[in-house]
Regions:
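His/Asp/Glu-rich mid-to-C-terminal helical/loop segments that flank catalytic regions of hydrolases
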Residues: 89-120
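Active-site-adjacent substrate-binding region
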Residues: 4-98
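Acidic, glycine-rich loop-and-beta core segments that form the ion-binding/anion-interacting portion
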Residues: 1
Length: 120
């Protein structure tokens, strides 16, 4: 899951409804503390898989240093020398009693995960 537009973050780094699966290349907080950064070759491979399967996708950031953001376990998996990137759908009101997502994004995520499992 990735938050949609937040008032403290730049819009160009935000996820949008209706634009598909979201990839978060870099995750972490306070600089390099508990962080993960997918390498360019792995990101290129994922992009190729999504393009070949005609899956709509976008990139976004989980937050902004010292202004809050999302948490992830990607760094734990990366500690085992795995190539890791976070992916999900844009969510409005994340972790609130009523969360909102787009059906289009959910369907593209489903298609993207199927394509990844077939090709990776």
């Amino acid at each position: 899951m990735t938050r949609t537009i937040h008032r403290l973050w730049k819009r160009k780094n935000s996820a949008y409804f209706g634009k598909g699966l979201v990839f978060n290349k870099y995750t972490g907080a306070r600089g390099k503390s508990g962080s993960n950064d997918a390498n360019a070759e792995y990101v290129a491979r994922l992009r190729n898989i999504m393009d070949t399967a005609d899956v709509s996708f976008q990139t976004a950031e989980l937050g902004k240093v010292d202004e809050g953001g999302g948490g992830t376990i990607a760094y734990i998996l990366a500690n085992y020398d795995m190539n890791v990137i976070d992916s999900g759908v844009p969510v409005l009101n994340m972790h609130a009693p009523w969360e909102i997502i787009s059906k289009v994004d959910l369907y593209e995520a489903f298609r993207g995960y199927i394509a990844f499992l077939k090709e990776a």
